[in-house]
A protein has these predicted regions:
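Conserved "right-hand" nucleotidyltransferase catalytic core of DNA-directed polymerases
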Residues: 1-274, 289-291, 362, 375-380, ...
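Conserved catalytic core of nucleic-acid polymerases
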Residues: 18, 25, 131-161, 169-170, ...
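Flexible loop/turn segments at secondary-structure boundaries
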Residues: 75-76, 145-146, 169-171, 258-263, ...
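Function-dense linear segments that define catalytic or interfacial modules
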Residues: 250-335
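A structural signal for short, well-ordered beta-strand segments
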Residues: 297, 458-460, 501-503
């Protein structure tokens, strides 16, 4: 265990509070015209994707109605099975929530042999069949009817048709399996109404799919993503604007378990990164011909894991500029873009997945032995002291950490994840923010017009006056690369892991061009 005082981390947090106050007051300028166009484009794409999806639904389900917003319907569509007894299903697979310690968590799924799992699925979730729909003869397709009273008048209230259950259509099974025929991997894929179809599960299973199933899954994930963009981000950017077209997000240091900043009104921390997210175009400079300047740490959490673990291979890879995503792609047998989602999962305790993912996680553990050994040390530390302490003095409590009968530690994923995420985004990034704020006040005379307007995970965003462009680029670079000296001053440690940053600038937050920092 590292014997450190928590005071340095506390001082850092107090100083950061002042900086965050300035960021909130400065606000972020929103272009109403850009935002309106973004909404229109999203809604067109959303409608087009919905139509494409429903054509595939009709192809694989026949006339069976499917509501894409229903987890039960999606389960039947993807896995071609429909649960006949939900209560028994939940009981067999131990689905639901329970109190563990003081926290309400999902129950751990039942462990069972593959053969037993397959048998249970066959018994409780028969294969779904395609259907043909015909108009209900009882209600003539209306779904309800009125009784004729003795007086000869029709009853005022409508009665739901029992024959068609109110839908106006009678669905008759045809002898053909419906759906996309995805096979569940085991109890971990079960959900209350069937099987999981959430984003994480579909991303994991995408490599197992082909043909129509893969096309549908890819379109559905994009459809779901755009719906989230509209309902969460576009709506929020419209809702929280003041009369001058600014939004003023609230930043919080005490919400996430790791100490990473969170924000609300709106929540910027969940916004997708980079040029793949058109809603960023709505964020513009408040100055005529002004700029949005963003500084982003490259692979910060990977480098932090190397520093905390002392892994010699990570130091070597960073020094030589190794493309770690290409290594992932090579091991998994996928393209580099697809590999990106998996590269750093082992840093956070990722060990399970499909065959390709498991192969990569195993290879990562063998390549980065220092990280693997460090993970073991963290678990032993958590079990023996009930906490993990960072070089900054920041502590994470794990009061329920114990080895179970299989040699695993309760909360092992958090034990491995919190130190990396915490030191990177709750210690290093705040150092850079505070340094930048100090430089803005002390070096620019009279006071700088440019302001810090946002921070998202390991990036810092500024609104830059056109007359201060070169100065702000220089100051942001200096602030983000000061970590070695500042970590020594604040925490008394030698942070010897090389840090690299990317600076980009443009007239809105979407259309940014990279700056060659060697020219600064």
């Amino acid at each position: 265990m590292v014997n450190k005082s928590i005071l340095p981390a506390l001082r850092l947090s107090m100083e950061l509070t002042d900086v965050l106050t300035d960021i909130e007051r400065a606000g972020i300028k929103i272009s109403k015209g850009n935002l309106s166009q973004i909404r229109e484009d999203y809604e067109k794409e959303y409608s087009s994707l919905y139509n494409d999806l429903m054509r595939i639904v009709e192809e694989v389900m026949g006339d069976t109605p499917i509501n894409l917003d229903s987890p039960d319907d999606r389960s039947m569509l993807f896995y071609s099975r429909k649960v006949s007894d939900k209560a028994e299903w939940k009981k067999i697979f131990n689905i639901g929530f329970e109190l563990r310690g003081n926290t309400k968590k999902q129950k751990r799924r039942t462990k069972m042999r593959r053969a037993d799992f397959v048998r249970a699925v066959k018994d409780l979730a028969p294969v779904a069949l395609k259907t043909v729909g015909t108009q209900c003869s009882s209600c003539r397709g209306l779904g309800s009817y009125r009784y004729r009273l003795k007086s000869g008048d029709l009853s005022k209230n409508k009665t739901k048709c029992k024959m068609c259950k109110g839908c106006g259509v009678i669905y008759t099974n045809v002898n053909q399996a419906a759906g996309l025929k995805l096979k569940p991997r085991g109890p971990e894929d079960t959900a209350a109404g069937g099987f999981k179809t959430d984003k994480e599960t579909l991303e994991q299973r995408l490599l197992d799919l082909d043909g129509t199933a893969k096309v549908f899954a890819e379109k559905y994930m994009k459809y779901s993503k755009i719906r989230t963009y509209l309902n969460t981000f576009v709506d929020s950017l419209e809702k929280f604007q003041d009369e001058k077209g600014f939004i003023h997000p609230q930043f919080m240091q005490c919400v996430t378990s790791t100490g990473r900043l969170s924000s609300r009104t709106p929540n910027f921390q969940n916004m997708p990164r980079g040029s793949t997210f058109p809603a960023r175009k709505a964020i513009v400079s408040r100055f005529n011909n002004g700029y949005i300047l963003e500084g982003d740490y490259r692979q910060l959490e990977f480098r932090v894991a190397g520093f905390l673990s002392g892994d010699a291979q990570i130091y070597e890879d960073v020094k030589n500029g190794v493309d770690v995503h290409s290594y992932t792609a090579e091991i998994m047998g996928v393209d580099r873009q697809a590999a990106k989602a998996h590269t750093f999962k082992p840093l956070y305790g990722g060990i399970l997945g499909n065959e390709k993912e498991t192969r990569y996680y195993s290879a990562f553990k063998k390549k980065y032995l220092g990280v693997a050994d460090w993970h073991e040390r963290l678990q032993r530390e958590a079990v023996s002291t009930k906490k993990v302490v960072l070089p900054s003095g920041r502590e994470y409590a794990f009061p329920y950490a114990e080895f179970n009968s299989r040699g695993n530690v309760a909360g092992s994923t958090s034990i491995k994840n919190y130190p990396v995420q915490g030191f990177a985004t709750a210690d290093i990034l705040p150092i850079a923010l505070i340094k930048l704020s100090t430089l803005l006040r002390s070096i620019i005379k009279p006071a700088a017009k440019s302001v810090i307007i946002n921070t998202v995970h390991d990036s810092i965003i500024m609104d830059v006056h056109p007359d201060e462009k070169d100065q702000m680029i220089y100051l942001l670079k200096e602030a983000m690369l000061c970590i070695k000296d500042e970590a020594h001053l604040r925490f008394g440690i030698l942070f010897d892991m090389p840090i690299d940053i990317e600076l980009k600038i443009g007239h809105d937050w979407l259309n940014l061009k990279e700056i060659d920092i060697n020219d600064i």
